Amino acid sequence: MAEAEGESLESWLNKATNPSNRQEDWEYIIGFCDQINKELEGPQIAVRLLAHKIQSPQEWEAVQALTVLEACMKNCGRRLHNEVGKFRFLNELIKVVSPKYLGDRVSEKVKTKVIELLFSWTLALPEEAKIKDAYHMLKRQGIVQSDPPIPMDRTLIPSPPPRPKNPVFDDEEKSKLLARLLKSKNPDDLQEANRLIKSMVKEDEARIQKVTKRLHTLEEVNNNVKLLHEMLLHYSQEYSSDADKELMKELFDRCENKRRTLFKLASETEDNDNSLGDILQASDNLSRVINSYKTIIEGQIVNGEVTTSTMPDSEGNSHCGNQGALIDLAELDAPSNSSPALAPPTSGIPILPPPPQTSGPPRSRSSSQAEAPPGSDSTNNALSLLDEELLCLGLTDPAPTAPKESPGSSQWHLFQNEPPSDLDFFSPRPVPAASCPSDGPQLPPPVSTSSMSQAPLPAAFPAPVVPASAPTHSTGSFMFSSGPAPALAPKAEPKGPEYPSSSTSHRLDALDQLLEEAKVTSGLVKPVSCFSPGPTASPLLPASAPARPLLPFSTGPGSPLFQSQGSPQKGPELSLASVHVPLESIKPSSALPVTAYDKNGFRILFHFAKECPPGRPDVLVVVVSMLNTAPLPVKSIVLQAAVPKSMKVKLQPPSGTELSPFSPIQPPAAITQVMLLANPMKEKVRLRYKLTFALGEQLSTELGEVDQFPPVEQWGNL
């Protein structure tokens, strides 16, 4: 984030640690420190940049980076101290001095300076317990033999605490009004100023009383949690006395009451108040000890809670597992303790059929899942807000399965019994392709319309569009479903020429007319030759089948089949029946989300995926996120969408239909739903939606329109 003068943290640091510098350039070092104080996330970004520079193979660059770090610790205050005091950054410093990492390749000058900095921080920042732990571990491992001498000019002197400010008297409007009234010589203005001062003093007293009550509540909560936790550690069902059990029951009741008090405190506290973090931490500790009591004493099974998590120590430092862990140099050669990959669920997701044979490599659900690292820490560091939503929501939706196909003869009868009016060239229904010339392979009986609409290609194996000439399983307009192959037509005996019945000829006339319509729309249709080479699967008919067409089409010079020399295939693919995009395979784009609906705490956002589905560059993948920040539950949520006739829209099943009420100590509840939007004509997208839901007990129906979609030319590369 560039601030004044167009400088960013990275540019300041690059100039301050430039290897071509003859000496330390304090102008850029101080500029880097000032930039940290200006930016909201300055300390977090700074420690990441400094860790990279400190591990530089160039000694002078690493030494300058350590000088910058030392200056930042003196000038950037508590926010930077907290970031440096985390294991995430301390581990990077340990790697510099450890021979099992970079210690053998780093100069002694750099390693000595790192050790001096760590030792000086243990003296100047006793509240940062993790720095002390890291330094003592280095001493236990023999990397640090003795404490280094620290010159006075290198000693970290904590900056004085900022002057306490009174938020009541810092109100700019009231201060200006008070100054104007005091300058006035009108007695009425002076009386008004007196009343204003009294009201401001009362507000300040109320604020102080509120802060005092909050501190008292937090202290009482911490004492109860600590005492109950210690009693639970020493609890034994056989040897614990009744008095101990009564005391634990009393402490448990107090904790239950205090939890409601903390909820109220959190809801009354402003988001930018520093005490909100203390309230949330106390609430977490309270929830853990309550769940531990229910598990140990009452024998209840508490879902989703780790009852063995540690409580805060006497200094108030919580050693939770999610805070990271210090590198144990003594056990680096042992197998890592990373959490194993989650086993695939055994229920809820039906087994998918084998993938169809296509010319392109199939993509499976397992391959996309295997790319994700098993550890949750790296995932949390790499993912944005949208990634977290996609990982946490909607992953257990059952995948669509392909129903069994009926035998080929019954499919053929279904086709014959279908009225000719249902043969719509531009509809998503499958249409039988015209047969090839006499020496080409004969086409099998087409599948029924119902089987095409009910048996989409499994989500784990999206297949590319294949030319009509290739007798493979595909989901194109003129191809067959991804289900089992239809039964082969029986071998025709060499009898006299047979002609279809009158009803069959009626169907043939309709199909002939269909081909004529395809000829008229030649601007959109790209004919594909039946003899075009390409990877094909096994023939659908035996090689011994006679070489006459399955249907007696005329192939004279005037017939459309003769003129097109192949099966007509429509150019713009509109159907989305066979397109399914699993939520976990979606990659978020850099495009900003669009707010489609935002009323009464119920909000709907459109997030755009980075890539299009395989073989469908005209389809935009949209992840619809529904969030609830209202104090009431939202139920029976149904979202419907409509687009112009030249486009097609499809909504996949949502991850849920209900949203729980908003809680100030938990992230807002959310629902995700994947929406596919086909736009083969590359027109401007205008989408209308209908949203029905129940907010509390009130039913609502909302209509809206969204036209802020990414440019069509950028689809697939957002």
UniProtKB/Swiss-Prot annotation:
<feature type="modified residue" description="Phosphoserine">
    <location>
        <position position="275"/>
    </location>
</feature>
<dbReference type="GO" id="GO:0031901">
    <property type="term" value="C:early endosome membrane"/>
</dbReference>
<feature type="domain" description="VHS">
    <location>
        <begin position="16"/>
        <end position="146"/>
    </location>
</feature>
<dbReference type="InterPro" id="IPR044111">
    <property type="entry name" value="GAT_GGA3"/>
</dbReference>
<dbReference type="Pfam" id="PF18308">
    <property type="entry name" value="GGA_N-GAT"/>
</dbReference>
<dbReference type="GO" id="GO:0031648">
    <property type="term" value="P:protein destabilization"/>
</dbReference>
<dbReference type="GO" id="GO:0032456">
    <property type="term" value="P:endocytic recycling"/>
</dbReference>
<dbReference type="GO" id="GO:0006622">
    <property type="term" value="P:protein targeting to lysosome"/>
</dbReference>
<comment type="function">
    <text>Plays a role in protein sorting and trafficking between the trans-Golgi network (TGN) and endosomes. Mediates the ARF-dependent recruitment of clathrin to the TGN and binds ubiquitinated proteins and membrane cargo molecules with a cytosolic acidic cluster-dileucine (DXXLL) motif.</text>
</comment>
<dbReference type="Pfam" id="PF00790">
    <property type="entry name" value="VHS"/>
</dbReference>
<keyword id="KW-0597">Phosphoprotein</keyword>
<dbReference type="GO" id="GO:1902430">
    <property type="term" value="P:negative regulation of amyloid-beta formation"/>
</dbReference>
<dbReference type="Pfam" id="PF02883">
    <property type="entry name" value="Alpha_adaptinC2"/>
</dbReference>
<feature type="region of interest" description="Disordered">
    <location>
        <begin position="477"/>
        <end position="506"/>
    </location>
</feature>
<dbReference type="InterPro" id="IPR038425">
    <property type="entry name" value="GAT_sf"/>
</dbReference>
<feature type="compositionally biased region" description="Low complexity">
    <location>
        <begin position="334"/>
        <end position="350"/>
    </location>
</feature>
<dbReference type="GO" id="GO:0034394">
    <property type="term" value="P:protein localization to cell surface"/>
</dbReference>
<dbReference type="GO" id="GO:0032991">
    <property type="term" value="C:protein-containing complex"/>
</dbReference>
<feature type="region of interest" description="Unstructured hinge">
    <location>
        <begin position="299"/>
        <end position="588"/>
    </location>
</feature>
<comment type="similarity">
    <text>Belongs to the GGA protein family.</text>
</comment>
<protein>
    <recommendedName>
        <fullName>ADP-ribosylation factor-binding protein GGA3</fullName>
    </recommendedName>
</protein>
<dbReference type="InterPro" id="IPR013041">
    <property type="entry name" value="Clathrin_app_Ig-like_sf"/>
</dbReference>
<comment type="subunit">
    <text>Monomer. Interacts with GGA1 and GGA2. Binds to clathrin and activated ARFs, such as ARF1, ARF5 and ARF6. Binds RABEP1 and RABGEF1. Interacts with the membrane proteins M6PR/CD-MPR and IGF2R/CI-MPR and the accessory proteins SYNRG, EPN4, NECAP1, NECAP2 and AFTPH/aftiphilin. Interacts with TSG101 and UBC. Interacts with ADRA2B. Interacts with NTRK1; the interaction is independent of NTRK1 activation and ubiquitination. Interacts (via VHS domain) with BACE1 (via DXXLL motif).</text>
</comment>
<dbReference type="GO" id="GO:0140318">
    <property type="term" value="F:protein transporter activity"/>
</dbReference>
<feature type="region of interest" description="Disordered">
    <location>
        <begin position="395"/>
        <end position="455"/>
    </location>
</feature>
<dbReference type="InterPro" id="IPR008153">
    <property type="entry name" value="GAE_dom"/>
</dbReference>
<dbReference type="Pfam" id="PF03127">
    <property type="entry name" value="GAT"/>
</dbReference>
<dbReference type="InterPro" id="IPR002014">
    <property type="entry name" value="VHS_dom"/>
</dbReference>
<dbReference type="GO" id="GO:0030163">
    <property type="term" value="P:protein catabolic process"/>
</dbReference>
<feature type="domain" description="GAT">
    <location>
        <begin position="171"/>
        <end position="298"/>
    </location>
</feature>
<dbReference type="GO" id="GO:0055038">
    <property type="term" value="C:recycling endosome membrane"/>
</dbReference>
<dbReference type="GO" id="GO:0061462">
    <property type="term" value="P:protein localization to lysosome"/>
</dbReference>
<dbReference type="GO" id="GO:0031647">
    <property type="term" value="P:regulation of protein stability"/>
</dbReference>
<dbReference type="GO" id="GO:0045732">
    <property type="term" value="P:positive regulation of protein catabolic process"/>
</dbReference>
<dbReference type="InterPro" id="IPR008942">
    <property type="entry name" value="ENTH_VHS"/>
</dbReference>
<comment type="function">
    <text>Plays a role in protein sorting and trafficking between the trans-Golgi network (TGN) and endosomes. Mediates the ARF-dependent recruitment of clathrin to the TGN and binds ubiquitinated proteins and membrane cargo molecules with a cytosolic acidic cluster-dileucine (DXXLL) motif. Mediates export of the GPCR receptor ADRA2B to the cell surface. Involved in BACE1 transport and sorting as well as regulation of BACE1 protein levels. Regulates retrograde transport of BACE1 from endosomes to the trans-Golgi network via interaction through the VHS motif and dependent of BACE1 phosphorylation.</text>
</comment>
<keyword id="KW-0832">Ubl conjugation</keyword>
<dbReference type="GO" id="GO:0031267">
    <property type="term" value="F:small GTPase binding"/>
</dbReference>
<keyword id="KW-0333">Golgi apparatus</keyword>
<dbReference type="InterPro" id="IPR046996">
    <property type="entry name" value="VHS_GGA3"/>
</dbReference>
<dbReference type="InterPro" id="IPR027422">
    <property type="entry name" value="GGA1-3"/>
</dbReference>
<keyword id="KW-0813">Transport</keyword>
